[in-house]
Amino acid sequence: MAEAATTDVKKLSFERALEELETIVKRLEDGKVPLEESVTIYERGEALKRRCEDLLRQAEARVDKITTDAQGAPTGTEPLDVQ
């Protein structure tokens, strides 16, 4: 964890950031971390959460739905509504 804690959050992939965030959550839930360390890893967890949210927003923006005309020919793209 020490090596991960020194890695710049902005350089982490979504999967790596999520993995580290899950580790932090487990450590905090165990309740065996000293107070000062708890605060430090909580702050890192917040940064990791923001990183994951940013990467998800970027991925959603890249997912496009192809639009077609009456004959079925592609006319362009529009944001994909997944709901």
UniProtKB/Swiss-Prot annotation:
One GO cellular component this record assigns the protein to is:
exodeoxyribonuclease VII complex
Q: Which UniProt keywords apply?
A: Cytoplasm, Exonuclease, Hydrolase, Nuclease
Q: Which domain of life is it from?
A: Bacteria
Enzyme Commission identifier(s): 3.1.11.6
**What reaction is this protein's catalytic activity?**
Exonucleolytic cleavage in either 5'- to 3'- or 3'- to 5'-direction to yield nucleoside 5'-phosphates
Q: Which GO terms describe its molecular function?
A: exodeoxyribonuclease VII activity
Look up the record and give one Gene Ontology term from the biological process aspect. Answer: DNA catabolic process
Where is this chain's protein located in or outside the cell? Cytoplasm
Instruction: Extract the SUPFAM superfamilies matched here.
Output: XseB-like
Q: Enzyme class, one word?
A: hydrolase
Q: Check the record and name the InterPro entries matching this protein.
A: Exonuc_VII_S, Exonuc_VII_ssu_sf
Q: What is its main location?
A: cytoplasm
The UniProt entry's sequence similarity note says:
Belongs to the XseB family.
Which PANTHER family is this protein grouped with?
A: EXODEOXYRIBONUCLEASE 7 SMALL SUBUNIT
Q: How does it assemble?
A: Heterooligomer composed of large and small subunits.
Q: What does the UniProt record say this protein does?
A: Bidirectionally degrades single-stranded DNA into large acid-insoluble oligonucleotides, which are then degraded further into small acid-soluble oligonucleotides.
Official protein name in the record: Exodeoxyribonuclease 7 small subunit
**Taxonomic lineage from the root:** Bacteria, Pseudomonadati, Pseudomonadota, Alphaproteobacteria, Hyphomicrobiales
What is the primary gene name for this protein?
Answer: xseB
